[in-house]
Amino acid sequence: MTFCDENNLDLIKKDLRYLKLLANQYPNISSASTEIVNLEAILNLPKSTEHFLSDIHGEYESFTHVLKNASGVIKRKIDDVFGNSLRDNEKLTLATVIYYPEQKLELIKQSEKDLSDWYKITLYRLIELCRVVSSKYTRSKVRKALPHDFAYIIEELLHEHDGTINKHEYYNGIVSTIIDIDRAPEFITAISKVIQRLVVDRLHIIGDIYDRGPGAEIIMEELMKHHSVDIQWGNHDILWMGAAAGSEACICNVLRISLRYANLNTIEDGYGINLLPLATFAMDVYENDPCNSFIPKTINKELTQNELNLISKMHKAIAIIQFKLQGQIIKNHPEFKMDDQLLLDKINYEKGTIDLDGHIYKLNDTFFPTVDPKDPYKLTENEDDLIKKLTRSFVNSEKLQRHIRFMYSKGSMYLVYNSNLLYHGCVPLNEDGTFKEITIDGVRYSGKSLLDKFDSLAREAFFFKNGSSAKRFALDMMWYLWCGPNSPEFGKLRMTTLERYFIDDKGTHIEYRNPYYKYRSNEKVVTNILKEFGLDPDCSHVINGHIPVKTKAGENPIKANGKLLVIDGGFCRAYQPETGIAGYTLIYNSYGLLLSSHEPFSSIRKAIEEEKDILSSTIILEQVVSRKRVADTDIGKELKKQIAELKMLLIAYRKGLIKEQDSKS
């Protein structure tokens, strides 16, 4: 609003009640004017950097490193600041100090002959680098990012200018004193963490924090400490959310996947869930069963034969319970249209065969001691008792509940942010590329409205009162989101879990994808998706995860003429031989979009000791002619609204509609 509008008082009078509330914060012309100047200045700052990660799958070491190196942003900043004035090995050491300050400093102490000199050089370099990465923020924002113990000192050093002789001596004196009083390691650690924090302003996690990796709970702890993060739920996240909410079918799936990959760290050590009842049950029921189809898939894990035997039996036990519980859900919800996954009643238990759509297949395992052929989906008394105990463990795990509450508070099915549409799986489509229409509770949904409905149901599953019919339905929908034919998280027509365990013919294992995956390279279809979510397709993108990009086979992560980007992080080691790389991440800064492809990460130990960073290749997707400013972002839109409201308040003061007050001290 401009001041030429002063004579038009209708809008101001209409909003007078709100403006009086605003006047409590800005009680006079002076304070309102100062805030307008401040906000206008912020609008002209460069847009801050966003970092996009996806499909972490519990691989906490790789995730931690990519988070610390910001997909190569810190190395690029070091190159920008120091150019050819530092050798490559010096740049590597400086980068490693920033990533892992405490651990790297311990090694430096053991190898460096003149430690004071090394401290001095490193401090100057870190201060110079921090000055550059903080330059796109207001002093107020930088101040909030500073650690309490060193806040004043770091702020002084960041705003020293070489042209001021007196200040230069003051600056040198601070650095020397830090070293003299043996506080250099603590200061280096503090300023390194400030650089880590400032180099990326917003972190987007596009799904699948959980899965087969050994440290999902460690990743969640890191995310809870992060200054600004959002999460778009993945199918594996939905499964854990359903389990934490009390869905027995989701709990069985979570346990089955963990046992399939012999990953019990997260279950037992991370969340304190007691698996002894499951182990006891499995050893009793499957004592003499080799459970050959349930031997866990281990990657870089050494297990004893006894451990393998026990895990295999637990694996089979929970899988059979899962098939029974899923069958009950399907029977209770004919509207799910999943009768093709009712398979226990298709087994001929005498002949050891199964009938799939009129085709008879031989089973590779015919030992089903807990299945009643006349009522195959009914739990035995012991199975029912077991699943109740396991459910209590999940819903009473304090740490799991805390993590999942965070997942809800920071997460959603999708996010529109700075002209980008972020989601993990897909927007369900028909064969002709139009939005798939699905009926839930008698109401038809498609496109954006469908994802909004699933988002609402996911929250009802966790937050609604236990025992209510609405909660029960929402819990069943969490399982549907995991494997249902029209789930935007699953993105396939059916899940062939039982077939993969019990039928050797791999033709029965195929899982056909939703037509979305055929059309996500089609610019017209992606344009329609962007419009559906209220975005301008000429300057917007879909950021997508879920399906690994098979770079090895020549697949390109850039689709639909650059309108859709696939950034499955490739953290999951099992996919890396298939994809050929360790996935993609995305950076969106004031200059444009940068897509990074990564080689597999070895270990944090090697990163510290041998300075082995992840090798990354960066593609510049879009480069703007003039740098994007805060004014061009979602935050900028909000600031402009605030400025307009403050200008209205100024007019109200000048017209005498609101009386000025003294500024509050």
From Swiss-Prot:
GO molecular function: fructose 1,6-bisphosphate 1-phosphatase activity
Coiled coil: none
Pfam family, one: FBPase_2
InterPro entries: FBPtase_class3 (IPR009164), Metallo-depent_PP-like (IPR029052)
Cofactor(s) named in the record: Mn(2+)
EC annotation from Swiss-Prot or TrEMBL: 3.1.3.11
Cysteines joined through disulfide linkages: none
Statement: the UniProt record of this protein carries the keyword Hydrolase: yes
Lineage: superkingdom: Bacteria
Record field: catalytic activity: beta-D-fructose 1,6-bisphosphate + H2O = beta-D-fructose 6-phosphate + phosphate
GO biological process, one term: gluconeogenesis
Keywords: Carbohydrate metabolism, Hydrolase, Manganese
Biological pathway: Carbohydrate biosynthesis; gluconeogenesis
Family per record: Belongs to the FBPase class 3 family.
Protein name per the record: Fructose-1,6-bisphosphatase class 3
Gene: fbp
